[in-house]
Structures are given as C-alpha cells and as structure tokens.
Design a protein with these regions (language model features):
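Compact, glycine-rich, soluble single-domain proteins
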Residues: 9-93
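Short structural boundary motif marking the start of a folded domain
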Residues: 2-6
Length: 93
C-alpha cells in the first residue's frame, strides 16, 4: 500500500515528517465564495497547490487517526506522495 509523507511547518517550528495514508484539511473559498471546505488527499494525488483557511487537519493511517490539530491559514502542496503544509500556526489536539 502507498503512503504519504506529511510535513507541517509554521514560522516558529517544523514538525517531524509523519507517515500516513490520508490527510484532510480545510480549503479556502474562491473570490465568489465557492469551492472551499474539507478536502482529502490520498497516495497518488495529482500535483497541487491549495490555499488553506483556519480549521482542522487530520492525518490517518490504516483508517485510524494519527494526528489531529488546528491549523491557521496558509498553503498546502502535493508533489508525488509528499504533502507539505505551511501555515501561520498549528496546534495538536
């Protein structure tokens, strides 16, 4: 089974990379208020760059949550099976 590498960075810290098989986070709406909301990323996802709004971030491995937290606004990128999240803040729950 393919896995993702999740990297979370804030201006104050960079968390150690985490191995997971899915990530859920909150996307910003576009200028007309469309398209935002919860978004899921799985292995094999296409290359992407996304604007994030404040909200929850969840990472799962084999269907079990392994990381739950609250993100500040920022960006997420997907390249290969690496998800990089750069946000104003991140607080584990």
């Amino acid at each position: 089974m393919n896995e993702l590498k999740l990297i979370i960075a804030t201006p104050q810290k960079k968390l150690p990379p985490l191995t997971c098989d899915s990530v859920r986070l909150m996307l910003c709406d576009d200028a007309k208020g469309r398209g935002g909301g919860e978004y899921g990323i799985h292995p094999g996802h296409i290359k992407a760059l996304m604007a994030l709004q404040e909200g929850p971030l969840h990472a799962f491995l084999h269907g079990e949550p392994i990381l739950e937290g609250a993100c500040g606004a920022g960006f997420a990128s997907v390249e290969g099976n690496t998800v990089t999240v750069v946000v104003e803040s991140f607080q584990k729950k």
